[in-house]
Curated annotation (Swiss-Prot):
Name used for this protein in its record: Ribonuclease HII
Species: Pseudomonas putida (strain ATCC 47054 / DSM 6125 / CFBP 8728 / NCIMB 11950 / KT2440)
Localization of this protein: Cytoplasm
Main location: cytoplasm
UniProt keyword annotations, A-Z: Cytoplasm, Endonuclease, Hydrolase, Manganese, Metal-binding, Nuclease
Domain of life: Bacteria
Residues that bind a divalent metal cation: 18-19, 110
Catalysis performed (reactions): Endonucleolytic cleavage to 5'-phosphomonoester
NCBIfam families for this protein: PRK00015.1-3, PRK00015.1-4
Length: 207
């Protein structure tokens, strides 16, 4: 049985903000901002990594139905490569908060840094396992990104993307070395850059 966070901790017009996808070698970094409704409890909210896939999917629908406002945003691979992953994540978080149709009185950001926002903000280390609104944001972001990675499995077969979701597992690294990077791989990340340079070397030697 999975125990969720205490919904009584939910505060009026406080947005929780979280990201998924800083570590993977491919795909966008996805963020979400959520303002929960204290009058509409959602049972079982917790850090998305502590929940089963089926539970995350069920909570995703419930959060979308019951939240006062939510926004799912992203920074694309091209932005990650041009800005760096930290700055791209901050940009995606900024987009998520700006996309809320209700202006929060405070934004609580998972982690130890805050993006530049037009509203007051505070970081909360391990906030996704403490603050219900951040937990809700982590669920929206993770489900969204996982669905995208499963779709990419069909577009770029052979990499196992649907399983590892882009993270640098042995299966992924082996496929990257064997097949080379796809358009969704982050070329600013060392393993991808190494695979790309190796492919370039092979191409040059054949000319």
């Amino acid at each position: 049985m999975q125990i969720g966070l205490d919904f009584n901790l939910v505060e009026d017009l406080v947005a929780g903000v979280d990201e998924v996808g800083r570590g993977p070698l491919c795909g966008a970094v996805v963020t979400a901002a959520v303002i929960l409704d204290p009058a509409r409890p959602i049972l079982g909210l917790n850090d998305s990594k502590k929940l089963t896939e089926a539970r995350r999917e069920a909570l995703f629908d419930e959060i979308c139905e019951k939240a006062l406002s939510f926004c799912i945003a992203r920074a694309e691979v091209e932005e990650i490569d041009s800005l760096n992953i930290l700055q791209a994540t901050m940009l995606a978080m900024q987009r998520a908060v700006e996309g809320l149709h209700i202006t929060p009185k405070l934004a609580l950001i998972d982690g130890n840094r805050c993006p530049k926002l037009a509203v007051p903000a505070a970081p909360v280390v391990k906030g996704d396992s403490q603050v219900p609104a951040i937990a809700a944001a982590s669920i929206l972001a993770k489900v969204t990104r996982d669905r995208e990675m499963s779709a990419f499995e069909l577009i770029y077969p052979g990499y196992g993307i649907g399983g590892h979701k882009g993270y640098p597992t042995p299966v992924h690294l082996e496929a990257l070395a064997r097949l080379g990077p796809t358009p969704i791989h982050r070329r600013s990340f060392a393993p991808v850059r190494a695979a790309w340079e190796a492919r370039e070397g092979v191409t040059d030697s054949l000319i």
